Regions:
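Short, positively charged low-complexity motifs
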Residues: 24, 28, 35-37, 42
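Cysteine-centered motifs
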Residues: 2, 8, 12-15, 39, ...
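Charged/polar low-complexity intrinsically disordered segments
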Residues: 20-21, 32, 51-54
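Internal, conserved structured core segments that host functional sites
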Residues: 170-226, 247
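Conserved nucleotide- and phosphate/pyrophosphate-binding catalytic cores
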Residues: 78, 210, 216-391
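N-terminal Rossmann-like or analogous alpha/beta NTP/dinucleotide-binding catalytic cores
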Residues: 62-192, 347, 351
Length: 391
């Protein structure tokens, strides 16, 4: 009998593996270990110790959680700022990547647009390289345990700290007629997204770091209130130094779905659409002094070129700018063609995946089951800790 068999982490009526010689692996790895029964059929567990080793290795991985709001199609900012790193993370971590449709409700989408946007993000996750066999991809609303934990955490989240959230204040200023409770408690729902899987690593941008700090606060507050060190502390994690901020084409800030169609290059944009958007990008009359500082709208174009073009191409146009010889029309044409080339593989996969509705349904169902397996363990524990117990 092999060592893995002797140190089986479970010895219960639900598992295929039985025996008296249970080891200390579960105590060492704690609640991060998924239930083996749901990971592999009993025939595999009895016939292949290498499969057991694979399951235990997966269980020992640190947990990563992140998601993107389903408010429209994904763009270059989403890809280079987040998804590109998601694809790398899935090979080394136990990753949960979700489609944040509950978060999108603060903007009151129609039922039709809500469903369409969720489907689009799912398609684009897959087309961009997230593998449902390596990472758990799920729709937030398919995991009701998240909303339940959100409720419990809300009981210990206070008005003052929620009102001090920078993103809440920004939303109030931008849209004062739509100051709803969902906006106010957005950080609590984000905390529930993270804590439901007991994640320790969360890929976030600078604009979300305050929310992540609040998630730590809510988790630690729960632990103190019930005198139980249950929730681990989650921290920002972006896998490598390759995380970049992608500027929009309007020259006013980062690329975003809410900034208008002309601001963003979407992953599924057709070549002619990309060319039209880039050619409309804001520019000035050109440099008049050698090596002068680039204004924001011009720097944005060069920042985009740094991401999608070759180093030689970037250096060529940068030199033309520094010597006052740049022609913005030529720069934009080159940038557009490089964007078309960069997005071509993803665009092709988007079209192929979108046509396979049975595959999409299978991925969504499988992801929901895997996410709920993790979430239900947490909620069961949380109910017990709070005091919701059967008679």
């Amino acid at each position: 009998m092999c060592a893995l068999w002797r140190s089986c982490i479970y010895n219960c009526r639900d598992c295929a593996i039985k025996g008296k010689e249970t080891g200390n692996i579960r105590r060492r790895l704690g609640p991060q270990i998924p239930h083996i029964k749901s990971c592999a059929p009993s025939s595999i567990l009895f016939s292949s110790c290498s499969k057991i080793e694979k399951i235990l290795t997966f269980a020992a991985m640190e947990i990563v959680v992140s998601g993107i709001r389903s408010t429209g199609n994904l763009h270059l900012g989403n890809y280079y700022g987040a998804i590109q790193n998601f694809v790398k993370m899935q090979h080394e971590y136990n990753c949960f990547f979700f489609i944040a449709d509950l978060h999108s409700l603060t903007t009151h989408p129609t039922p039709a647009s809500l469903h369409t946007n969720v489907k689009s993000v799912l398609i684009e996750y897959l087309a961009a390289g997230i593998d449902p066999e390596k990472a758990t991809i799920y729709v937030q609303s398919d995991v009701p345990e998240i909303a339940e934990l959100y409720l419990y955490l809300n009981m210990n989240a206070y008005l003052g700290e929620l009102e001090r959230s920078t993103s809440f204040k920004d939303k109030v200023r931008a849209n004062p007629e739509n100051v709803n409770a969902g906006l106010l408690t957005y950080p609590v729902l984000m905390a529930a997204d993270i804590l439901i899987h007991k994640a320790t690593k969360v890929p976030v941008g600078k604009d979300q770091e305050q929310h992540l700090e609040m998630a730590r606060t809510f988790g630690n507050r729960f632990n103190r209130l019930y005198n139980n060190e249950y929730f681990p502390e989650p921290y920002a994690f972006n896998f490598s130094n390759s995380l970049v901020k992608i500027p929009g084409l309007d020259g006013k800030g980062k690329m975003g779905k809410s900034e208008g169609e002309g601001n963003a290059i979407f992953l599924g944009d057709a070549p002619e659409v990309i060319r039209k958007k880039v050619m409309r990008a804001v520019t000035d009359s050109g440099p008049t002094v050698e090596n002068q500082q680039k204004p924001d709208e011009i720097q944005n174009l060069f920042d985009l070129m740094k991401v999608v073009s070759t180093q030689d191409t970037y250096d060529h146009f940068n030199n033309l700018y520094n010597t006052c010889q740049v022609r913005y029309g030529d720069l934009k044409k080159q940038l557009a063609e490089d964007m078309i080339i960069a997005t071509a593989p993803i665009r092709d996969r988007i079209n192929a995946i979108a046509a396979d509705t049975s595959y999409l349904s299978k991925v969504a169902k499988m992801g929901a089951e895997k996410a709920r397996e993790s979430a239900s363990r947490t909620i069961k524990d949380v109910r017990e800790i709070i005091g919701f117990r059967s008679f």
